[in-house]
Amino acid sequence: CKELKDFDLVIVVGGDGTINEVINGLYDYDMNPVIGIIPGGSFNDFSKTVNIGADPVEASENLLDAEVKEYDCILNDDKIALNFWTVGMASENAQKMQEADKSTFGVFTYIPKIFETLTQDNSFDYEMEIDGKTLKGNAVMVFVANGLYSGGVEVPISDISPSDGVLNVFIVEQSKIGAFKAMFGQSNSFDFNEENEGVQTFKAKEIKFISPEGLIADTDGELYQKTPSNIKVVEKRFKFLSKPFEQ
């Protein structure tokens, strides 16, 4: 981005981590070309959000007649994310996955680490501001969503949109196993629009996560930021080639 200035289209070949690097570079240098995605990662969350296809060949073909659509993004201090920002249980699981052996046996190393996280009591007392309103309580996870998917799973709320000018906030206060099942295990049938004990949901333009300090935040699978955090939506910041969803 520092060297290339006059271009209209960027094709990103890779997963959400690669896309994260590209959009942060474009944001830093105030560039806004059209972006096309050819998925090549583990989960490919944002390629699903733009409905371009999970298969690289299929996605390449879909790009030929895709439409340009503007999408919001999450600004966390000075870094950008497209899909989500989270602390607590999901971030702890991401850290366990990062620690796991990346060899053939990596997945088998990761599974017991997941259950280790689920069975530990790692809840925390939080203080937050959501659009100026102060909230305090105890939680196992705070999850801020912009995209439609997280970790390959559809975010379980029916009216979420990455182009509506707001972020969706989930504060999970129930037991870890219950929260894990609700948010990631039953997303096709479980809808947080319904009243659910132990889970608070909000729509917000700005979130301040005040305490506790020092929690590692997972932003689109990247683990390089810690709390406290100032989070806000940047409306229609990026242009992606996308396909409409069938009604």
Descriptions of predicted regions:
Residues C1-V13, N20, N24-G25, E58, ...:
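ATP/NTP phosphate-donor binding region
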Residues V13-G15, G40:
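Glycine-rich beta-strand-to-loop/alpha-helix junction loops that act as flexible
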Residues I23-L26, K48-V50, V155-P156:
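Short amphipathic alpha-helical segments
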Residues D28-F143:
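Catalytic core of DAGKc-family lipid kinases
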Residues T86, A90, F143-S158, L223:
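Glycine-rich phosphate/pyrophosphate-binding beta-alpha loops
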Residues D101-F108, V155-G178:
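Gly/Ser/Thr-rich active-site loops/lids in small-molecule metabolic enzymes
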Residues N122-F124, N138-V140, S163-N168, K203-K205:
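A generic structural signal for short beta-strands and their flanking turns/coil linkers
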Residues I130, K136, S161, I171-Q247:
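ATP/nucleoside-binding phosphotransfer catalytic cores, i.e., glycine-rich phosphate-binding loops
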